[in-house]
């Protein structure tokens, strides 16, 4: 039996130590912004921050959910910061970002789940950096009527919402969420604003069966999702769900081949794939693939 306490070689990454990494870290700290890169202990932080790529986390740093895979703090959330959209826009300008990814904690305590705050952030960035493309990675807005409409009207270039895992594991891994609500949100955004690229991702290695992963792939395509990401689950701390399996690079290639036959514009499946990993480059490829599809 494999030793799951020891990560295989294909998971290991170099510790961050570049000048660019520390410059990005200092700027984020000075502007008092949160990032999912730090809060979720992303393994790709060194590479991304060295390239001045970062995923900013809005709506505070405390989540109202307690998902078993996530390293973000949970509890009573912070008060909304009305100046956060302006500070975020300033950071985008100072980092000279061509593409920015904005995510957030879940805010079940807010009437719209934080949708209008996302919209304000998009608006502020459009004012100061009109050429920057904007990708948002949102919560599920469970039971938040009108939230999808607010997001669709804000017109991000990419709308991302992760289903995270297969339906059979929701009760233990993602207990505060509903699988079909997530699918519905993705489909609704596409129906409300067909020009917005939609994206979703999931983790493997939590104990799911391969046929369950394929079913999720089918469900996401049925919801008109354009871009699919699949990555290895890594246990953030001993208090989180344990890794059931380290999926091999060959198995990821198989899943990628299967997904590509379903009609997605883009698929990224590898051990270190994360929702926002290489988001800038992937957005360019996404647009190119869309144009090629129109011409075919």
Curated annotation (Swiss-Prot):
Pathway: Protein modification; protein lipoylation via endogenous pathway; protein N(6)-(lipoyl)lysine from octanoyl-[acyl-carrier-protein]: step 2/2. Its cofactor is [4Fe-4S] cluster. The keyword Transferase applies. It holds the Pfam family Radical_SAM. It comes from the Bacteria. [4Fe-4S] cluster 2 binds at residues 63, 67, 70. Transmembrane segments: none annotated. Its EC number is 2.8.1.8. This is Lipoyl synthase. It comes from Rickettsia africae (strain ESF-5).
């Amino acid at each position: 039996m494999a030793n799951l306490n020891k990560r295989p070689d294909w998971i290991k990454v170099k510790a961050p130590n570049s000048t660019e990494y520390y410059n990005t870290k200092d700027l984020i700290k000075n502007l008092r912004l949160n990032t999912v890169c730090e809060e979720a202990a992303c393994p790709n932080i060194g590479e991304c921050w060295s390239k001045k790529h970062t995923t900013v986390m809005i709506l505070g740093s405390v989540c109202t959910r307690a998902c078993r895979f996530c390293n973000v703090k949970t509890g009573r959330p912070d008060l909304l910061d009305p100046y956060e959209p302006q500070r975020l826009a300033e950071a985008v300008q100072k980092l000279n970002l061509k593409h920015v990814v904005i995510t957030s904690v879940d805010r079940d305590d807010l009437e719209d789940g934080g949708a209008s705050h996302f919209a304000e952030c998009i608006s502020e960035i459009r004012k100061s950096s009109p050429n920057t493309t904007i990708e948002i990675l949102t919560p599920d807005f469970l039971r938040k009527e009108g939230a999808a409409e607010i997001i669709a009207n804000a017109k991000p270039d990419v709308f991302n919402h992760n289903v995270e895992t297969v339906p059979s594991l929701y009760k233990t891994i993602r207990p505060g969420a509903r699988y079909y609500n997530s699918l519905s949100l993705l489909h609704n955004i596409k129906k409300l604003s067909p020009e917005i690229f939609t994206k979703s991702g999931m983790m493997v290695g939590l104990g799911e069966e391969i046929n369950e992963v394929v079913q999720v792939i089918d469900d996401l395509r049925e919801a008109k999702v354009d871009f699919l990401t699949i990555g290895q689950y890594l246990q953030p701390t001993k208090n989180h769900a344990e890794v059931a399996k380290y999926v091999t690079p060959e198995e990821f290639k198989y899943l990628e081949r299967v997904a590509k036959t379903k009609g997605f514009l883009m698929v990224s499946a590898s051990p270190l794939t994360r929702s926002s990993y290489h988001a800038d480059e992937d957005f360019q490829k996404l647009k190119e693939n869309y144009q090629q599809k129109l011409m075919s």
